């Protein structure tokens, strides 16, 4: 089995404990190394780990692959890491990197044009107020560094009406997807997974929002 999103090891542990199959685990975030070491100690040769992205899955040269699983989105450990600025409940620098990234969220917010920000919020977050939010960001960054709490204030200032979900949800989702190239990674990961999977193998994908579903 290939577990493409090792995280805290939930899927890998269940598979290793409930059958005799081996696990090949991937994760682009090297902060999982301590958990990886525990798995190596407990499961020995039945467990292998690679610090790689979805799009690198074809670099794994293994025979007899039966199934490949993708559990999309962030792990609880990543969300609770306040230094990443992934959650709109955190404070400080906007980072949002999962690992093996070319740029951070701070780079996006501080350098990209108003039009580019608009497109990110619109296409990856389906944000109705993408235009005024992107405009406010460009205005504010002329005078100060925009941190997580500042971005939340901008969004709440634009979106006056109450809604069922947190007002910042769509913008933060869009930024996370863009910074980590999540859709591109998923597309390449699925294409390459199909290529390396033998006839009769299975691919499972756990999604969390409509953009991933599409």
Predicted feature residues:
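S-adenosyl-L-methionine-dependent methyltransferase catalytic core, i.e., the SAM/SAH-binding region
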Residues: 1-214
């Amino acid at each position: 089995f290939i577990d493409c999103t090792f995280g805290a090891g939930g899927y890998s542990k269940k598979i290793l404990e409930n059958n005799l199959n081996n696990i090949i685990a991937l994760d682009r975030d090297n902060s999982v190394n301590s958990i990886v070491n525990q798995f190596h100690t407990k499961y020995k040769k039945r467990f292998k780990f690679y610090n790689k992205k979805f799009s690198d899955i074809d670099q794994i040269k293994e025979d007899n692959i039966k199934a490949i699983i993708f559990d999309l989105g962030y792990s609880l450990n990543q969300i609770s890491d306040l230094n990443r600025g992934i959650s709109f409940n955190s404070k400080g620098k906007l980072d949002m990197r999962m690992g093996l990234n070319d740029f951070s969220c701070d780079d996006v917010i501080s350098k990209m044009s108003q039009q580019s920000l608009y497109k990110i919020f619109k296409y990856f977050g389906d944000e109705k107020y993408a235009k005024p939010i992107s405009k406010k960001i460009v205005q504010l960054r002329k005078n100060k560094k925009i941190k997580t709490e500042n971005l939340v204030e901008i969004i709440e200032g634009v979106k006056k009406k109450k809604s069922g979900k947190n007002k910042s949800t769509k913008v933060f989702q869009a930024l996370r997807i863009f910074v980590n190239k999540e859709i591109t990674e998923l597309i390449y990961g699925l294409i390459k997974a199909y290529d390396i999977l033998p006839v009769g193998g299975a691919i499972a994908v756990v999604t969390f929002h409509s953009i991933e579903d599409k």
